[in-house]
Amino acid sequence: MTQVFGEAGSGKTNLCMQLAVECVKNGKKVIYIDTEAISPQRFRQIAGENAKEIAREIIIFEPNSFEEQYSAVKEIEKLISDRIGLIVVDSATSFYRFELDQDESSIRSRRELSNQIGFLHGIARKYRLTVVISNQVYSDMASGTLKPIGGSGIEHISKTIIQLEKTGEGTRRAKLWKHRSLPEGRARDFRITNEGLR
């Protein structure tokens, strides 16, 4: 399971769409849980002239609440076939209300989010599928840095974690936070263009 996190406008949804398009171009189908309201125009730009054909190979869920997101995640396993090559959840945390206090609602929300991520991790392992989740950030007052929402549960389950950062007008940086075999801190700059990430 791969987690991609970053502030708003850092390129998370662009990356998720581009991964889905490339997966379809390689002959596989995609299951895509969209909580970010993908722009059809942006999808057409990234997918190119075959956008309609590519879109037919992407199974999209568009939940409107955390509960609907949970239902969509649970529905995924019924759709698994040898044609599925990628599962995307963009964003896993948009309906999740991050609360620093430990009230009962906050604890329940954390547990439900952990259950969803754990379920996706189980599907990834069982069916040998790639699962990509995008994640939002919060500002950690103690360190003065942006950190992914969801805490250590999502971090532990994610085998690869990539942070996307804004570095300028249209330019971004992808920084490796966690990987099994590559050193942390490795970074690559890229641009967001009409055709996707370059």
Q: What do the PLM-derived regions correspond to, one by one?
A:
Residues 39, 95-96, 140:
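Catalytic P-loop NTPase motifs of RecA-like helicase/translocase cores
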Residues 111, 118, 122-198:
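Phosphate-binding/switch region of NTP-binding enzymes
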Residues 61-126:
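Phosphate-binding/switch loop-helix module in NTP-utilizing enzymes
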Residues 49-51, 105-106, 149-152:
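Short, hinge-like loop/turn segments at secondary-structure boundaries
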